[in-house]
Amino acid sequence: MFVSIGNSRMDKKFNCTDMTYEDFVSRLSKTKYTAETMEQYRKMPKGQQDNIKDVGGFVLGKLKGGRRKKDCVISRSAITLDMDYGTQGIIDELEMFFDMKMVVYSTHKHTPEKPRMRIIIFLTRDVTPDEYGAVSRMLASDIGIELFDDSTYEPSRLMYWPSTSSDGEYVFQEIEGNEVDPDEVLSRYKDWHDVSAWPVSNRQSSIVQRDIKKQADPLSKDGLIGAFNRTYTVTQAIDKFIPDVYRHSRAIPGRYDYIPADSAAGVVVYDDLFVYSHHATDPCCGKLMNAFDVVRLHKFGDKDARAAEGTELSLIHISEPTRPISIS
């Protein structure tokens, strides 16, 4: 199976290699113990935690040019799910109730009282990025979708190799079963291309509306941004400036399709002030955007990537997009 490997989450290019199941599982079976204790790790700011657990990572699949970007995933060779809300005895339940070939290992924040696991489910064939979203969400729903991190279904999602605090517990378990046939999973949908039919957690069902309430009224923004938003509604801006990116969906009136994707109706417009894309391969997936944001990100988003880290957005002549939120 193809695995794209990076030495750090900061790597610009990941190396794709064809690994055997045995070699891949062998690497997961051993953890790297880090110097800090569990209590010290718990009290650290998130950035410091991220640096400690970054012992290199992988994406199970092929990446275009080795780039780990949303629109650079060619295919995925297995499903990887982060179980951030695990329950005690969850591994026994997976073994007892599911006939799927899986590997489970604990993440850096795992404790026996609050299990945090990474589950890898092996497939009979590679899947496209859009198929990945539909298959991973259906399988998570079977297990219990409330158990999983809401951003875990992104095809470009990096998974770290195992690491554990010096006094922490590392858990690793191979679970015997059959490789999952993606076509059988997809057939359980009336139409898997319809993103609106994909399972979501209760957290996701309210997060967009909650985030809208936190955002400033786009019509009241100062300067060029406010003027643009007052001149063009979201739908007017999309139809005029990026009709080659989004098109009106036939599946659900009032929604848009992301044209390069196989899935449909994943772009939702809210009161013609905000737009949110659920399409996993959309570079704007997971961002709540006003009219100015959606145009500038699709037309000039590469300026973000070229700017040095920490550069003020005003210095590269673009606005700050509304805060990304974890939903796919």
At which residue positions do the language-model features occur?
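Short secondary-structure junctions
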Residues: 99-102, 147-149, 238-251
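Acidic, glycine-rich loop-and-strand cores that form catalytic or ligand-binding grooves
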Residues: 219-246
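Single conserved hydrophobic/aromatic residue that forms the stacking wall/gate
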Residues: 316-327
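Long, charge-rich alpha-helical interaction segments
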Residues: 177-228
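N-terminal single-stranded DNA-binding subdomain of primase/primase-helicase replication proteins
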Residues: 73, 240-301
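Short, conserved secondary-structure transition motifs
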Residues: 112, 122-127, 148-175
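Signature for HUH/AEP ssDNA processing cores
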Residues: 1-115, 122-134, 138, 202, ...
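Hydrophobic/aromatic-rich, well-ordered segments within soluble, folded domains that form packed cores
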Residues: 108-128, 132, 181, 185-199, ...
